[in-house]
């Protein structure tokens, strides 16, 4: 079997249940539904951090925030090991079109080409920098920063920077595909290098704006989160937007409709990429196709918008891997993490995976062997806020003086009740607190913490 090409499709802020394949009867996502029907769906996939920069850099590095040292808006060290760098070392042409959100002077991080890059300037680029001056410089580029309820109020028909950039990045991917497989056919070496092509779009990240047709289609079909009880917790209740007070119910409906429209837009743009590959003669059944997002979107649930929380809407992400040459379509319920994609891609490509990662290959699950899977996953926000999910229980710790939270997703799938002090959960809470220390968090943190303790060596 030849070394497989890989298509890595990614979005920004896509909550997992706004997809047809998860049973949402309102949203139109035929492309993602096709991937799900013919691929492997991971129903309990979680981001390592429910915010863009750490989530994406952990995905690329196969390491959790504490391991990689990216617990906020910080740089990934130059020449850090990423799955793109590992694949390129083993002959892959690694090409990224769209958003990466890398910080620091190494804007490639293992990608051999970035036809339409998303370069982010940080203060670490500037010699003899002044942080104050840089903040003013950076602020001049911030044309759509979040500010309380502003994004909800201006939601509707429009063409935000996310919309225009996604169109540009999709077009760049289409041009690259034509050039790589078609235009260069007669002058490239025979036995061309295998390809890793990442197409990473900004939508459905706010601003909540979409085109007229999609907006009007969804406006009276969506069911917005209106009568939401706010969870009584100092962190989980932060940035509440109150229906009828901060924003009107109509404004919430408009923002929800626009969000759905953006999801449909990226679905159609992914279809363009798939059709382009088919047009140049590629058999998609021979490709590994991955789809995921960096985190979810609260969309008004619990009165909260955006992300940054450990509620399911924010921390759970869509994840599909399609490779019909090797795997039958199935749905997997085990807890997995975006960090696991590093080891998985190495395994599927038949190359070694570096040791010392917080990454576990998902291939055994895809093969139907779940007996030895440690059914837990981890997510971190900032330096002190940590979530550990074990089976159906989801524990959260918010630092030395923070209030602990325990959700039971079987008994309370809407996450309205904190079971942390319930007698039935004493043993579970004890286990979570011990695991918290093992992961280098909490008052009894293990000073020798290195990584999550997963075995990531994959030899094929």
Per-region residue spans from a language model:
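Formylglycine-dependent sulfatase
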Residues: 1-396, 403-404, 413-434, 441, ...
């Amino acid at each position: 079997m030849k070394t497989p090409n890989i298509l890595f499709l990614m979005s920004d802020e896509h909550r997992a249940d706004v997809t047809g394949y998860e049973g949402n009867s309102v949203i139109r996502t035929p492309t993602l539904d096709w991937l799900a029907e013919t691929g492997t769906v991971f129903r309990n996939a979680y981001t390592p951090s429910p915010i863009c920069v750490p989530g994406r850099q952990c995905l690329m590095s196969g390491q959790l925030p504490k391991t990689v040292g990216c617990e906020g808006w910080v740089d990934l060290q130059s020449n850090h090991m990423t799955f793109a760098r590992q694949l390129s070392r083993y002959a892959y042409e690694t090409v990224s079109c769209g958003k990466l959100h890398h910080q620091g002077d190494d804007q490639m991080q293992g990608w051999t080409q970035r036809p339409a890059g998303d370069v982010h300037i940080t203060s670490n680029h500037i010699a003899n920098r002044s942080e104050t001056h840089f903040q003013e410089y950076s602020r001049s580029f911030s044309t759509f920063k979040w500010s309380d309820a502003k994004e909800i109020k201006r939601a509707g028909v429009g063409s935000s920077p996310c919309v225009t950039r996604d169109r540009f990045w999709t077009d760049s991917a289409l041009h690259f595909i034509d050039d790589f497989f078609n235009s260069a056919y007669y002058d490239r070496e025979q036995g061309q290098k295998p390809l890793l092509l990442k197409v990473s779009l900004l939508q459905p990240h706010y601003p909540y704006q979409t085109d007229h047709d999609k907006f009007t289609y969804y406006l009276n079909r969506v069911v917005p989160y209106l009568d939401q009880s706010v969870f009584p917790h100092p962190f989980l209740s932060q940035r509440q937007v109150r229906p009828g007070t901060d924003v009107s119910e109509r404004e919430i409906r408009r923002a929800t409709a626009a969000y759905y429209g953006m999801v449909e837009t990226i679905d159609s743009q992914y279809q363009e990429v798939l059709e382009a590959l088919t047009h140049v003669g590629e058999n998609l059944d021979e490709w590994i196709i991955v789809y995921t997002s960096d985190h979810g979107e609260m969309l008004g649930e619990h009165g909260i918008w955006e992300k940054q929380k450990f509620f399911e809407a924010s921390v759970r992400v869509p994840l599909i891997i399609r490779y019909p040459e090797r795997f039958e379509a199935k749905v997997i319920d085990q807890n997995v993490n975006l960090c696991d994609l590093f080891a998985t891609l190495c395994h599927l490509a038949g190359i070694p995976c570096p040791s010392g990662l917080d990454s576990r290959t998902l291939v055994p699950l895809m093969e139907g062997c779940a007996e030895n899977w440690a059914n837990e996953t981890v997510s971190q926000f900032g330096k002190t806020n940590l979530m550990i999910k074990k089976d159906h229980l989801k524990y959260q710790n918010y630092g030395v003086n923070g209030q602990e939270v325990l959700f039971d997703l079987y008994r309370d799938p809407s996450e309205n009740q904190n079971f942390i002090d319930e007698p039935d959960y004493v043993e579970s809470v004890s286990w979570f607190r011990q695991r918290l220390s093992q992961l280098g968090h909490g008052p009894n943190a293990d000073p020798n913490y290195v990584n999550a303790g997963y075995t990531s060596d994959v030899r094929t």
